[in-house]
A protein has these predicted regions:
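Electropositive, glycine- and tryptophan-enriched low-complexity nucleic-acid-binding patches
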Residues: 83-126
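Acidic, metal-coordinating catalytic cores used for nucleic-acid/nucleotide bond scission
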Residues: 137-148, 166-168
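Short, surface-exposed connector motifs at secondary-structure boundaries
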Residues: 8, 101, 126-136
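A short acidic (Asp/Glu
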Residues: 23-25, 36-37, 74-76, 146-154
């Protein structure tokens, strides 16, 4: 709850009778351990591949990627001011399969072009999987594409498909 809301460990402990702040803090730290969420996301994707209903959501060869801004301290090295909220934030670039599994995420500097993060996520995923489970298409927004990025994507064997703004 503390990670998913704007409450801290003390606030969550106050909501649950019999739970101490130290227990909540320890649970939060265990979730923050290196690669813990990455491995959990991989297990979810594995489960989805075996589940017949998830196969109705898609074949798993397409994904989308976008950045989310997460509040951060101004003292964090890669924190920048989020232009929408006017607070310091760090970017989290996330790749999501068409079957809704999170296959890759990485922190990035806010307000930067995101095509390199988009390409890296697909390449990391494709390297870990066999040929039949690789991505063939990644949908991104305007910040996630450049001409160089589209060229590199083609050379790596997948399509980088931008949703371009103001096309009408």
């Amino acid at each position: 709850l503390a990670h998913g809301t704007e409450n801290d460990a003390k606030g969550v402990a106050a909501m649950i009778p019999g739970i101490e702040v130290a227990h909540i803090s320890a649970a939060m730290r265990s979730l923050e351990a290196r690669d813990r969420l990455r491995k959990a996301n991989e297990r979810v994707v594995e489960f989805q591949r075996k589940n017949p209903i998830a196969q109705l959501w898609g074949t798993g060869d397409k994904a989308s990627a976008d950045m989310m801004a997460l509040d951060a301290s101004q003292h964090l090295y890669n924190a920048r001011v989020d232009p929408r909220r006017r607070t310091f934030a760090v970017g989290l670039y996330t790749h999501v399969l068409e079957s809704y599994g999170v296959i890759y995420d990485q922190p990035i500097v806010h307000n930067e072009r995101q095509s390199s993060a988009a390409l890296e996520g697909v390449e990391q995923y494709n390297v870990r999987n066999e040929e039949s489970m690789r991505l063939s298409l990644l949908a991104v927004d305007t910040h996630g594409y450049t001409y160089v990025g589209m060229t590199v994507a083609k050379l790596l064997g997948f399509d980088l498909c931008p949703q371009l703004r103001n096309m009408a």
